Amino acid sequence: MGNKVTGSGFPVYKGKGATLQRALINYFLDKNTSSGYTEVQPPVLVNEESAFATGQLPDKEGQMYHINNDDLYLIPTAEVPITNFYRNSIINSSDLPIKLTGYTPCFRREAGSYGKDVRGLNRLHQFDKVEIVRIEKPENSYKVLDEMVAHVKNILEELELSLIHI
């Protein structure tokens, strides 16, 4: 169906697939919020400054979808708008940690197809992601990264999903 509407790389979920997709999104968001993350619903379009501030531009410009009339970019990941909420801000250490979670559809012009080069993954141009973002003191960054990986790993294990080299 996606091929008919937009071309390859744009999936359509229908019936039980759509229901499962929605349930998983809600499950991940609920797990994240019950672990102290605040849910946000960021925009899926960002300006050039936001894409540049997160390193998407100029490095990944060829992978991003650009809307010429408005000079906006479709987000490749929720981290782009979420981290830009705090761009050019001074955050008091007493306000840390900042723990956010968000669901967004994401858009990338990813090359590749199912096979060894992409470890058996189908590369999609549109896909859904639930993400966690933490803003912390720099000296805590490695410890926090380990905590975030453990949090996600725990959720996947609860679902009895095999882990792809985390």
Predicted regions and their residues:
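TRNA-recognition modules of translation machinery and tRNA-sensing kinases, especially anticodon-binding
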Residues: 1-164
